[in-house]
Regions:
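Gly/Ser/Thr-rich loops at beta-strand to alpha-helix junctions
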Residues: 6-7, 58-60, 85, 119
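Catalytic core of DAGKc-family lipid kinases
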Residues: 24, 33, 72-169
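Glycine-rich beta-strand-to-loop/alpha-helix junction loops that act as flexible
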Residues: 3, 56-58, 79-81
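ATP/NTP phosphate-donor binding region
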Residues: 1-53, 63, 67, 71
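Acidic active-site catalytic centers that drive phospho-/nucleotidyl reactions
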Residues: 2, 59, 100-102
């Protein structure tokens, strides 16, 4: 559970799920992330066991859990509760139960939704940097887009190097 996703509403959802799981006497554990890559590190501890990880958070939390279940017998379940939930919105109509999806890697990091450079990546980064500003959480992304020219004046780098390896898909 990413406790800050969805403006903190993930905590409310986690309490509902916890109550249901106790009532049904399910074998489960609720883990609350504390920082970036925490979900990844937690899930990696279960390599070699067959576990279903329910990712309660946004796209970042889903990405960390998906990256950690790679090359294991574990499964990823998504309970969307972020500000955008782009990956879930993309797959929700076709993925009601179980499906396989493409996953890609850049250097040592996997991604299942989007990897981008330029404007989109800069806006996402600036949105993250602005999370503590006194701006309504649902408006931070729009504010970052509007202020993109201001953010990039001193930090603009147009050089990128791409190397495409033709390895078989995972």
């Amino acid at each position: 559970v990413n406790p800050i996703s969805g403006g903190g509403s993930a905590l409310k959802e986690a309490k509902k799920i916890d109550s249901f799981a106790k009532q049904e006497k399910l074998d489960y554990e609720v883990y609350y992330t504390k920082c970036e890559r925490d979900a990844y590190n937690f899930v990696k501890n279960y390599k070699g066991k067959k576990v279903i990880f329910h990712s309660l958070g946004g796209d970042g939390t889903v990405n960390e859990v998906a990256s950690a279940v790679m090359d294991t017998d574990n499964y990823l379940s998504i309970i969307p509760n972020g500000s955008g939930n782009d990956f879930y919105r993309t797959i929700r109509k076709t993925a009601l139960i179980e499906f396989k999806c493409d996953i890609c890697r850049i250097n040592d990091r996997y991604f299942i939704n989007v990897a981008s450079v330029g404007l989109d990546a800069d806006v996402a980064k600036n949105s993250y940097l602005m999370k503590d500003f006194k701006i309504p959480r649902k408006q931070i992304y729009n504010f970052a887009i509007f202020n993109y020219p201001i953010f990039c004046i001193n930090n603009y780098d147009t050089s990128y190097k791409f190397i495409i390896q033709r390895n078989p898909l995972l």
